[in-house]
């Protein structure tokens, strides 16, 4: 499981830069690190191997082609201008792997890049970023998702998150740990977000389409998934934003960072997360109104069905009588709060075993009432970017779903 312990990049967030860096507020970094340590330990205690993204990146930066690939993603920023781009490239080329990794993640300010010159450099404020930090790297599920032995590297729609995907691409291309893996999707393609890809069952993949993932990306991913023999059905699930009801519990003026149901694009995994072979945590306002189109391969292309209720389409594709729904809350107000705190973004470590933020009291109670064992972890600061345990994890290997103690 790839995770990223928050570090210096989170300390770069100020009240002024919150919106630009996709956070709702300035996080308490020390507490966020403590919460993440507890999360990682919970994964280990459950028998999951934890891989830290920072360590993987440092290892990868030992290889010249990987360095070139990562640096190129930085220098592609059109705001730099030719002169500053050349100077920055020379500066990055001279850094050791550890320092380069730190700069790629935490960013670089004008004051820290003292050898710069030229018009662009002079017009920057002392604390303006020459290289933007990547505080959203915390959510490793967004930048890549594994489908069997194949990895789909995201192509983020938001400019502030695109470098995350390029760093993951460099790791998968050059780190010995991932030698032989096949890439199904790349950051240069149509917008696709890992948080929109949900594995419902062996052979069945649901992909949300909306503000993060386009229909064109869904089509390309579906073709490649079928060609790889990983799935027989891909469900296309629209996740367009909806007006926020007065009782939704969503904070006024809120704009989604990682994805919410009301008022901004939502990741599919904040709406629906599997917690058993036949059960999913779902936002109650959408569970029975969400639709899906079933996509399957045929000789001359793709077969696309008419829209169906999501629950019916999912059950049919999964070969079960029905997909059980575990609501995130009791009523519209409670459900809205649960969604805002990513109550549905639980991490399933196996059938009937899930990791959830302890703050999601109502959702956790409902999970346990449905027979799901809940591993509670602190998340008051980790949730400041509106993500959850599932979003903070990227599984790179899974045991068969029939195994009693481990799953998808």
Annotate each PLM feature:
Residues 1-408:
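The feature marks the mature, well-folded catalytic cores of soluble enzymes
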């Amino acid at each position: 499981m790839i995770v990223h312990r928050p570090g210096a990049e989170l300390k770069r967030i100020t009240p002024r830069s919150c919106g630009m860096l996709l956070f709702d507020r300035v996080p308490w970094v020390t507490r966020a690190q403590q919460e993440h340590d507890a999360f990682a330990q919970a994964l280990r205690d459950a028998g999951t191997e934890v891989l830290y993204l920072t360590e993987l990146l440092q290892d990868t930066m030992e290889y010249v082609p990987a360095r070139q690939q990562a640096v190129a993603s930085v220098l592609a920023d059109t705001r730099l201008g030719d002169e500053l781009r050349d100077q920055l490239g020379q500066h990055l080329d001279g850094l050791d792997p550890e320092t380069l990794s730190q700069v790629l993640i935490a960013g670089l300010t004008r004051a820290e890049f003292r050898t710069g010159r030229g018009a662009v450099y002079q017009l920057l404020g002392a604390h303006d970023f020459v290289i933007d930090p990547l505080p959203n790297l915390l959510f490793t599920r967004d930048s890549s998702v594994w489908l069997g032995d194949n990895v789909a590297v995201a192509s983020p729609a938001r400019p502030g998150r695109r470098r995350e995907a390029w760093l993951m691409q460099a790791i998968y291309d050059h780190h010995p740990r991932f030698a032989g893996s096949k890439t199904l999707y790349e950051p240069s393609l149509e917008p696709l977000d890992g948080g929109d890809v949900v594995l419902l069952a062996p052979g069945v993949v649901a992909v949300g389409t909306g503000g993060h993932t386009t229909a064109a990306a869904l089509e390309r991913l579906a073709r490649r998934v079928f060609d790889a023999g990983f799935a027989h059905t891909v469900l296309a699930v629209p996740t367009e934003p909806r007006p926020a009801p007065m009782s939704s519990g969503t904070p006024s003026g809120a704009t989604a960072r990682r994805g919410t149901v009301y008022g901004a694009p939502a990741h599919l995994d904040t709406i629906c997360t599997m917690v058993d072979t036949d059960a999913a945590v779902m936002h109650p306002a959408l569970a029975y109104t969400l639709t899906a189109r079933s996509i399957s391969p045929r000789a001359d292309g793709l077969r696309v069905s008419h829209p169906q209720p999501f629950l019916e389409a999912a059950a049919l594709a999964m070969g079960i009588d029905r997909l059980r729904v575990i609501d995130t809350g009791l009523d519209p107000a409670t459900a809205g709060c649960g969604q805002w705190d990513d109550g549905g973004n639980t991490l399933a470590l196996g059938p009937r075993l899930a990791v959830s933020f302890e703050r999601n009291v109502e959702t956790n109670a409902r999970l346990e009432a449905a027979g799901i064992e809940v591993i509670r972890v602190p998340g008051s600061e980790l949730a400041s970017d509106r993500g959850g345990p599932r979003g903070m994890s990227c599984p790179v290997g899974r045991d068969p779903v029939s195994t009693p103690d481990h799953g998808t």
